[in-house]
Each structure stands twice: as C-alpha cells, then as structure tokens.
From Swiss-Prot:
Subcellular locations according to the entry: Secreted
Aminoacyl-tRNA synthetase as UniProt keyword: no
Highest taxon, organism lineage: Eukaryota
Record Gene3D superfamilies: Apolipoprotein C-I
Name this protein carries in UniProt: Apolipoprotein C-I, basic form
Other remarks on this protein: Apolipoprotein C-I is present in acidic (APOC1A) and basic (APOC1B) forms in P.paniscus, P.abelii and P.troglodytes and perhaps also in baboons and macaques. In human, the acidic form has become a pseudogene.
Any GO CC annotation of this UniProt entry: high-density lipoprotein particle
Organism in which the protein naturally occurs: Chlorocebus pygerythrus
Lineage: Eukaryota, Metazoa, Chordata, Craniata, Vertebrata
Entry keywords, A to Z: Lipid transport, Secreted, Signal, Transport
Presence of the UniProt keyword Phosphoprotein in the record: no
Biological-process GO terms, alphabetical: lipid transport; lipoprotein metabolic process; negative regulation of cholesterol transport; negative regulation of lipid catabolic process; negative regulation of very-low-density lipoprotein particle clearance; triglyceride metabolic process; very-low-density lipoprotein particle clearance
Length: 65
C-alpha cells in the first residue's frame, strides 16, 4: 500500500524537477522606473511650490516680522 501511494508522489516530484526553473516574471524595465521617479519628483515639486505660494499669500509672514 505504501509503494502504491509513494509512486505517484515520486512521479510528480520527478516531473517538477525535470521541468526546470520557472521562467522569470516580467523583468522590471529601467526606463519605466525612471519615468515613475521623474513623475514623482515633478509632483513633489509642484506641491512644494503650492505650499510656498500659500505661505507667501497668507498673513503668517507679516505676523512673524
């Protein structure tokens, strides 16, 4: 009975080993990563300028002088 159950398991394991390594999942593209980084930088810059302009237009600088 043990031999009867272990043979199918052995066949499955052997087929998995002989199949070889799995193909790599989509390799990350360097240019798309750089584009995302550039977009993030531009967004951050826009938000920073927005905050600076809001501070300049507020009464806070006049009150602190």
């Amino acid at each position: 009975m043990r031999l009867f159950l272990s043979l199918p398991v052995l066949v499955v394991v052997l087929s998995m080993v002989l199949e070889g390594p799995a193909p790599a999942q989509g390799a990350p593209d360097v240019s798309s990563a750089l584009d995302k980084l550039k977009e993030f930088g531009n967004t951050l810059e826009d938000k920073a300028w927005e905050v600076i302009n809001r501070i300049k237009q507020s009464e806070l600088p006049a009150k602190t002088r």
